[in-house]
């Protein structure tokens, strides 16, 4: 077993002595903790990046039983970790009575493993006696959930799924199939309490035929969650009711839980309830409502009723019991927070990334009673799975070598960028990147609250060093002079000059000759139509589309089935917003004829999809529902004259194959209809980074941006996008045009299909139109042609815009256009109002 240790500097939010239950022996609060009005993650100021405490991360590679199939879940009980695991069970052989061929499989057998977080020693509990499937039944035994106690004992919800077949006396499994006969399901649900060695302390049969089971209070067979409070009371839920039992398993009372569908959880030692999400639709009747979101509905033991519901923070799905410091702890975005109802405030306590831990493969976390935090990762290596336990424990920050910290602001962190930042921080002796994810400030009422907060901080002069610009208003920041021109760095760099990049993408990203963001890859957002139609028009604008529709059959649609007015407007605007807003000059042109024509075009689509169970499509004024079973692909509909255009994203060469080969290459990439007919395509940029114009460390910031782009492009084969590096793009292009043979583990060509010819590697595939719908009509392609490559390059050359989903502007448009779509306002008045509001917004933000 390998044992590795690294040190990591953590945010100041990690500074509670009594971090979790059991951390502070005397139960007193840390005197260093600020008062509730100045929480560790202040609501108006960015968190201090110099930590008072640091965490040491112990990495333990776990040695699992040889017959282990997979790990399902983990929880802490005191200072011990427990895993629900499934190991290889009984082998079953099945023989086809017709062909005589046989095949076998192994079923899974539940077991419970203990893990010592100090050493990583992992072992099955020696005295564990789980419920079993009756001998005359088929079935399985599963552990739905676990709850640990500080004394090291463990509660488990065990469900047994058993099926008994009514087989004839002469049944022969070699020649007959038991599934041809009637069967009876025999469910079982148990709450088991076990000691550290697996010995049974209690085993409560939740479905036992006792005094209550035959009455209306009897439990259902679908027990899905449970909890145990400090007094030993047990709570079980089947999504319909919540049952409360005493420590001996006697039913005390039940509550109707049909209104609050959710999972049971324990907030404090004596407080158990349902974690429930209240879905509120977007209808006008609910406009401005703050009732939506996550709630905790407590069980009141005294009144035997539901207590007063309490609003929870956004994304509260995994909850840990609270203590004297916080009402509860919860996971969000790979961090652990403490929350207080009284102040409606949250403090970030554990930031795995700040500990240089990559959480991409982390699927279980737990909090030990001594305050340590554990996480489990898994990584597939060939035919094996490596499980690693990462345990964080606090040390004095003075013991850690200090580094210069650069902050990176984002609204959600790209999966690959997370991994790259962790590796960068581990390997760089001088600098580290501290990520501030502003999506964590989202509320149920405002998912863009993080953008508002970041913008407010920028206005006040608190500007991060770096930006991940996805979902951020980069044009607005550039207009304010907040972001540096990256050309100034390129032009002084010998290894990453302008020639490094695909030039068409850089050109599209330019604002008045300056470059404010750099991606590691790109795709092309576009639309296509049959060449026989599209090539009749010199300009592909709204008028051309309307005329082209006259060449199709009655009831034909412009785009795919079900596109609505709002959907078309959002898609067209987000791919051509720069045609109506120029952040450099501040000029807006929503009162133009071009925008009014766009609104009129969108108004020709249906208001909404007609049914949840049907697909709606419409012509000029109507919405028609068709049965989902009649669905056809875009290619099939275009070929038969039912549809004019298909919207698509070309992320790599296989996307090109999928979209065009079904129509025998007889397509033209028209893009969305625009007034000039030339700007209907847009680049969607992958993981774009920007540098602050005010950073104290511009060279370090540029080195980081370079490193991230180079790393991504070196591993371009794993990136679902075209690489931004021209050299890497050319490599992928050459690869797409080159036939390759499948090889075995020895590097030898293989003939899996037995046709006598070595098998080729597929570069993509497409639907073959016109065949039997019951047949497999999929055709692989082994290499692109020069004509294919020419069309792809022509598409990239013709793309001049960048996908830009400016939430504030699109919200204004959406609000004002609703009256026009409803027939209550004309198009000119609508365009004038949008022009007035957007113009005011743009001037305020510049």
Name these PLM-found stretches.
Residues 19-22:
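C-terminal motif of bacterial Sec signal peptides marking the signal peptidase cleavage site
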Residues 60-62, 121-139, 200-220, 257-260, ...:
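Surface-exposed loop and turn segments in beta-propeller and other repeat-based domains
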Residues 116, 197, 201, 510-622, ...:
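Helix-loop-helix "hinge/cap" segment bordering the ligand-binding cleft or interdomain interface
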Residues 472-526, 540-544, 668-673:
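Hinge/lid segment of periplasmic solute-binding proteins
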Residues 578-675, 815, 830:
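Extracytoplasmic ligand-binding clamshell segments of periplasmic binding protein
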Residues 660-743, 752, 797-798:
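Extracytoplasmic/periplasmic substrate-recognition and gating elements
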Residues 683, 747-838:
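C-terminal capping/gating helix-and-loop segments adjacent to ligand/active sites or protein-protein/ligand interfaces
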């Amino acid at each position: 077993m390998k044992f590795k240790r690294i040190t990591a500097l953590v945010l100041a939010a990690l500074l509670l002595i009594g971090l979790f239950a059991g951390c502070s022996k005397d139960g007193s609060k840390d005197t260093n903790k600020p008062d509730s009005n100045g929480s560790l993650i202040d609501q108006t100021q960015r968190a201090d990046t110099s930590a008072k405490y640091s965490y040491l991360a112990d990495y333990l590679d776990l040695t699992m039983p040889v017959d282990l199939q997979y790990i399902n879940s983990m929880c802490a009980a005191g200072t011990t970790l427990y895993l629900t695991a499934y190991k290889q069970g009984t082998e079953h052989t099945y023989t086809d009575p017709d062909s005589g061929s046989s095949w076998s499989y192994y079923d899974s057998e539940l077991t419970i493993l203990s893990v010592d977080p100090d050493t990583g020693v992992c072992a099955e509990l020696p005295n564990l006696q789980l419920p079993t499937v009756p001998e005359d039944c088929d079935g399985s035994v599963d552990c739905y959930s676990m709850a640990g106690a500080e004394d090291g004992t463990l509660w488990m919800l065990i469900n047994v799924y058993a099926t008994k077949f009514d087989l004839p006396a002469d049944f022969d499994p070699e020649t007959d199939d038991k599934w041809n006969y009637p069967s009876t399901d025999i469910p079982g649900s148990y709450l088991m309490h076990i000691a550290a060695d697996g010995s049974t302390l209690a085993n409560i049969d939740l479905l036992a035929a006792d005094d209550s089971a035959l009455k209306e209070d009897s439990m259902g067979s679908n027990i899905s969650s449970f909890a145990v409070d400090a007094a030993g009371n047990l709570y079980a839920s089947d999504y319909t009711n919540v049952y409360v039992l005493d420590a001996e398993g006697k039913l005390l009372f039940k509550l109707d839980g049909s209104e609050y569908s959710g999972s049971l959880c324990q907030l404090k030692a004596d407080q158990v309830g349902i974690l429930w999400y209240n879905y509120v639709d977007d209808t006008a009747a609910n406009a401005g409502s703050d009732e939506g979101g996550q709630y905790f509905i407590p069980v009141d033991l005294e009144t035997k009723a539901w207590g007063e519901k309490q609003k929870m923070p956004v994304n509260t799905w995994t909850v840990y019991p609270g203590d004297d410091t916080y009402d509860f702890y919860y996971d969000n975005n790979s961090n652990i927070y403490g929350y207080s109802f009284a102040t409606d405030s949250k403090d970030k306590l554990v930031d795995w990334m700040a500990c240089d831990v990559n959480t991409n493969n982390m699927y279980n976390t737990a909090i030990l009673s001594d305050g340590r935090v554990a996480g489990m990762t898994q990584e597939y290596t060939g035919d094996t799975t490596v499980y690693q336990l990462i345990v964080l424990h606090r040390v004095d920050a003075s013991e850690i070598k200090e580094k210069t910290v650069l902050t990176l602001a984002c609204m959600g962190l790209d999966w690959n960028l997370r991994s790259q930042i962790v590796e960068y921080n581990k390997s760089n002796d001088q600098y580290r990147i501290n990520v501030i994810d502003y999506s964590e400030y989202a509320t149920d009422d405002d998912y863009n609250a993080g953008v508002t907060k970041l913008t407010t901080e920028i206005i006040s002069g608190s500007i991060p060093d770096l930006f991940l610009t996805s979902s951020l208003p980069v044009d607005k920041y550039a207009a304010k002079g907040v972001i540096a021109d990256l050309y100034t760095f390129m032009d002084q760099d010998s290894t990453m000059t302008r020639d490094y990049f695909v030039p068409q993408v850089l050109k599209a990203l330019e604002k008045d000759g300056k470059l404010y963001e750099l991606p590691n890859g790109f795709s092309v957002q576009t639309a296509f139509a049959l060449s026989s139609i599209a090539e009749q028009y010199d300009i592909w604008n709204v008028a051309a589309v309307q005329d082209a529709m006259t060449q199709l059959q009655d009831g034909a649609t412009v785009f795919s089935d079900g596109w609505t007015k709002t959907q078309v407007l959002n898609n067209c605007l987000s791919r051509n917003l720069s045609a109506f807003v120029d952040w450099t000059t501040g000029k807006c042109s929503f009162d133009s004829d071009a925008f009014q024509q766009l609104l009129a075009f969108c108004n020709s689509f249906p208001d909404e999809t007609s049914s949840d169970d049907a697909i709606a499509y419409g012509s000029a004024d109507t919405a028609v529902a068709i049965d989902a079973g009649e669905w056809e692909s875009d290619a099939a509909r275009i070929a038969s004259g039912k549809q004019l255009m298909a919207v698509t994203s070309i992320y790599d060469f296989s996307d090109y194959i999928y979209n065009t080969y079904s129509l025998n290459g007889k397509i033209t990439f028209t893009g969305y209809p625009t007034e000039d007919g030339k700007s209907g395509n847009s680049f969607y940029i992958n993981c774009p980074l920007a540098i602050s114009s005010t950073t104290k460390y511009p060279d370090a910031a540029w080195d980081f941006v370079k490193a991230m782009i180079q790393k991504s492009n070196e591993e371009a084969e794993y990136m679902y996008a075209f690489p931004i590096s021209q050299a890497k793009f050319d490599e992928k292009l050459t690869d797409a045009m080159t036939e390759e043979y499948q090889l075995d583990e020895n590097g030898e060509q293989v003939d899996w299909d037995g046709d006598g010819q070595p098998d080729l590697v597929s570069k993509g595939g497409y639907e073959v139109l016109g065949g039997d719908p019951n047949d497999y009509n999929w055709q692989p392609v082994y290499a692109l042609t020069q004509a294919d490559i020419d069309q792809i390059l022509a598409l990239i050359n013709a793309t001049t815009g960048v996908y830009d989903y400016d939430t504030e502007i699109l919200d204004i448009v959406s609000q004002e256009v609703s009256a026009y779509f409803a027939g209550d306002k004309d198009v000119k008045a609508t365009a004038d109002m949008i022009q007035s509001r957007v113009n005011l917004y743009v001037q305020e933000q510049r």
